[in-house]
Each structure stands twice: as C-alpha cells, then as structure tokens.
Amino acid sequence: MACQAGAQDKATPLLVVISIDGLRPDYVTAADAHGAKIPQLRKFLHDGTYALGVTGVIPTVTYPSHTTLVTGVWPAKHGILANQTFDPLQKNHEGWYWYAEDIRVPTLWDAASAAGRTTASIQWPVTVGAKINWNIPEIWRAGTAEDAKLLRVVSTPGLLAEGKAAIGEYRGGIDATPESDEVRGKYAVWILETKRPNLLTLHLIALDHIEHEAQPFSHKAMAVLERLDAVIGKVREAAERVAPGHAFVAVVSDHGFTTYEQQLNLFPAFHKANLFSVDDKGKISDWRAMPWETGGSAAILLKDPKNGLTTATVRALLAKLAEDPANGIDRVLEGEELHRKGGYPNASFFVGLKPGWRTGSGLTGPAVSSIKAGGTHGGLPDLPDLRAAFFLVGPGVPAGKNLGLIDMRDIAPTLAKEAGLSLPSADGTALLP
C-alpha cells in the first residue's frame, strides 16, 4: 500500500490527531497557574477551539478511551473494555487489548479508507492488524529486545527499516521515556513528509508514565510535558507545511489524573467469602466472582451472572465494604446503572473509589493500606480530575472558542465532519457547525 504515498493533495483535508496520554486539560487551560512553559499547546487556545474538559468513559483508562476517541461510542459498544483482558486464571499472561479485530464498530481510519484516503498511525492503542496504510502499533510483551522483533512483524512491512535508515531507530512498545516520544514525533513528521497520508494518529505516552510515578503537576511531570510541547509544535508545523490551508490538527487525551496515598484491595475479602479459590502455588484455580481492577475502580464479574446466590453474596459484601468510609469507596454501581453509562457489559457490579485511592491486586494482605503517593486514573469519568482534553485547529475552526465540558463520544464525529469524512456509527454529535 506504500505506492499510495502522495495521495494528499490540495483538495483533500489532512487530519492529524495527537494524543497526550494522561493530559489533564488544566495543564493548558490553567498553564499560568501551574507555571507551564508550553507555548505550542497554548497556541491551540488562541488559534482554535477547545474544551474545558472531556467526560470520558468507564473505566477512565487508555485502551477503551482511545478507542472511543476514534469511534464515537462507549466501550460497551466498541468492545474494548479495559487495558488488559479479563483473565482471572492468567492464561493470557497479562495480555492487553492489542488487536484491532476486537473493535466492533467503524473507526476514523475506516472512514478515511472508505472515502479513498490514506491513513497512518504511530503507537495508537488497539491497532495491531488494523487496516491502516502506514502503521506502527502499540504492543509489547516482555519489555526486552525481543519486543522490537515483534513490532517489526506487526507494523507495515518495511516501514520501520525505512524509518531507521532515514531518521534513526524507532523506540516503541514499553519505552515510555520522553526521548521515546520525541522519536515518535520524528517518525510522525517523516511519515507526513514522505507518505503524505490524509489521516495520521499519534500516541505520546511519557506524561502518563511520569504522572503515575510522580503525580500530576509535579516538577517531573511538568518537565516531561514541556518536552512534549516541542514535539506537538514540530508535528503541527509539518502538517501545515505539507497541507497548507487544509490541515486540521487535534490534541486530545484519554483521561485525566488524580493522586493517591491509600489502597483498597478487594481480593482478600472476595477470597474470604469463598468467591475464588487459590491452589498450593498461590494462584487462582477457580472463581465465582472476581474483581477486575483498573486503578481507581474495579468491575466485578460473575462466572455465572444468573447465579442468585453468588449475586446476593457479592452485593452484601460490597454493601458492607462501602458502608465503612475507611475503605475509600465512592460508589457501587450495579447492573443496569453501570450498563447505562456504557461500561463493562459483562460486569454485574462496579466499585468506584474516592480521589486519593487506588485498587490493589494482591490475593492476600490487608484490605486497606497506606502506600507511597503516586498518580492514578480509572475511576468514574464524572470526577473532575479525571476529565480528558480536546484542542483543535484548522481552516474554518473558530479561534478562541471554548466548548465547555463535552462528551468524549463527540470527538470522533467532530473530527470526521471537519475532515469531510462520514462516521454515521458514532453515538456522539459534531460540536462545530
């Protein structure tokens, strides 16, 4: 498909979507208050349209959120329910939702292809095997040098070798340093200049990584964001250079961030209630009900959702835990209430934690513990700190327009409309006339 390079022309819009994983909107909208030296991102406030916040999805984690960003539907509809697959017996060895075939609805890449346009993507989640002309997906397994071989196999044939010869080695997969994002930015510029795609998606991951370690708005987080700001500027400049007068550039994020110092581990309580069993090697051997933890929340899955006794046992257990404020539980959602919010169609319950808390995953130990402070997400999307970001510039996009608080499902149809694409499967609506 590389023979299609050069498909970008003056009559066809170029859409570039850059995701900064974990970017809270107030890094940009309140840049002065935080002392953020981010001139490129600040230009988006002046030059284009932006949201004060984006209400995300359940759970507020990377893979379901990124899939909503390109489909305009909730996880229950697009099928990417969390980062990692539910795997209580560890048969999938902590595998993630890597594969595009698991997405059940059309994406922006599909819409572009249907319109006869070319597509490119770098490090975007859930793109292994996607029908993208120039694709370097996000995937890793062991975090060793062997991962580079895997990435070469699942990327567009020859693309990484060509890029290496032109601009140097790609740094993919589990590498979440700011240096790795700078390399991804260089690859984005190179692909824009040499392949001329009509749609390019780029996922930058270093900010999320450092926020987990050092919390949002820490000195370390600010230093990383300032480096990513330069990447944003270079990619935007390249887009506007190769498609002068018809380049749209969006900066989005998947979720915000909150801090924690406390941990609630649901597993010991479930084990004590005989809801799962553990073998002599300390591994789960069978289960009736299990938490599926994602940072600031946990879905509760039942092996047999129609088993009334198990349902009643779990309901009583969660009610007892939620009654005690020392456990840090904000809300427990059940069945239809959860499903109306578009998350976890296979879950019977959902436990959302208060800010300052995260879920644990050990099968033993205390239910509640004080731990080293860090950053997390994954909680309910209506928590203000977990709101995501949206900024858009391009021809005809109103300058300095504040959209207020928007629904993440509105982003894909908004981008599709601006780029002249059709995405009727989206449940959101275009935000600009």
Task: Name each model feature, range by range.
Residues 74-215, 360:
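His/Asp/Glu-rich, glycine-adjacent segments
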